[in-house]
């Protein structure tokens, strides 16, 4: 068997040419759910540093994040809010995957570190502006005392 072959399929098809599979688990562990997935507990993702290698900081993410536009859209008859995979792929290609049918998907969880760094950048700018405002206030008081 191939590790990229289906190990378990719920639906009326077992290959990429039949798009009616509702749930598919591959031998390599990849899992596909073809519609909404409701979880009553937590969804947790392994993130232990011991599992990772070549760890580097993302650095500045705000300029790239500003190139992404949140969208409201209809998909499968339901109103949704999200992003377009094509836009994400332009700035964060590692967050976009493609299935056998060349349909793109976004790793929304992967946007969290991007948002954390952008938030830090904005907070640093806010702090810098607050310090600048205090200096301006002091200078205005000095100028007022000269008059």
Kindly label every feature range from the protein language model:
Residues 8, 23-39, 43-45, 49, ...:
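Low-complexity, small-hydrophobic/phenylalanine-enriched stretches
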Residues 11, 56, 74:
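Residue-level detector of conserved, well-ordered beta-strand and adjacent loop positions
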Residues 32, 47-57, 94, 98-147:
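C-terminal intramolecular chaperone/auto-processing assembly modules
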Residues 68-76:
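Active-site nucleophile-His-acid catalytic modules used for acyl/amide transfer and hydrolysis
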Residues 81-82:
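Residues that recognize and position ribonucleotide moieties
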Residues 88:
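Active-site-adjacent helical/loop segments in soluble small-molecule enzymes
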